UniProtKB/Swiss-Prot annotation:
Keywords: ATP-binding, Cytoplasm, Kinase, Nucleotide-binding, Transferase. It comes from Psychrobacter arcticus (strain DSM 17307 / VKM B-2377 / 273-4). The gene is gmk. This is Guanylate kinase. Its main location: cytoplasm. ATP binds at residues 10-17.
């Protein structure tokens, strides 16, 4: 059985990472693809778990060797998604989440046309500013850069299949789970999962 690919995008500070973390903790057969990046690790981040941290030279080499499904430069740092890793997980029947920006999402959609695209929005710019400031991961200069680009990022929601407003964490999480569950009940997924059962059911009907 082949897994489904879920692309989740949001402006920085929207709460995407926290939602995905909780979703993974409560959902079976679901994983998140670990991206490659040239940015410095933040406090508490582990190489190979949160990101594959690398330098610019190695990243550029990987691009030249077509190792990435998508790659982009964001605020002076490079980010990319390994195609080999994603395909291996999908082929193993695992549903895969890509946490990437809208540019990368559109790149991946051209390759995986069945990918399910989800955009998460904050309830307001004021809330977004507060969240970016409260988490204490970036300087005020970086926060202002992120806010300046946020409007353009959020305008891309129109290219996605689903939109979630993260005003209430538990509500947003429930809505995110609902998308995963609904996909797993589609005809295509159920035929893959229960092919033998369905064949036996129809065979019994014919025999009678």
């Amino acid at each position: 059985m082949t897994g489904s690919l879920f692309i989740i995008t949001a402006a920085s500070g929207t709460g995407k990472t926290s939602l995905v973390k909780q979703l993974l903790a409560t959902t079976n057969d679901l994983t998140v693809s670990v991206s490659h990046t040239t940015r410095d690790p933040r406090p508490g981040e582990i190489d190979g778990h949160h990101y594959h941290f690398t330098d610019v030279d190695n990243f550029v080499t990987a691009i030249s060797e077509s190792q990435f499904l998508e790659h982009a430069e964001v605020f002076g740092n490079y980010y990319g998604t390994s195609e080999q890793s994603v395909r291996a997980q999908l082929d193993a029947g695992v549903d895969v989440i890509l946490e990437i920006d809208w540019q990368g999402a559109l790149q991946v959609k051209k390759i995986f046309t069945d990918a399910i695209m989800i955009f998460i929005l904050p309830p307001s710019i004021a809330t977004l500013r507060q969240r970016l400031s409260t988490r204490g991961q970036d300087s005020m200069e970086v926060i202002e850069q992120r806010l300046a680009g946020a409007v353009n990022e959020m305008a891309q929601y129109i290219n996605f299949d689903y939109v979630i407003i993260n005003d209430n964490f538990e509500v947003a999480l429930t809505e995110l789970k609902a998308i995963i569950v609904a996909d797993r009940q589609t005809l295509k997924r159920q035929q893959q999962r229960y092919q033998r059962t369905i064949t036996n059911l129809l065979s019994n009907i014919v025999d009678k």
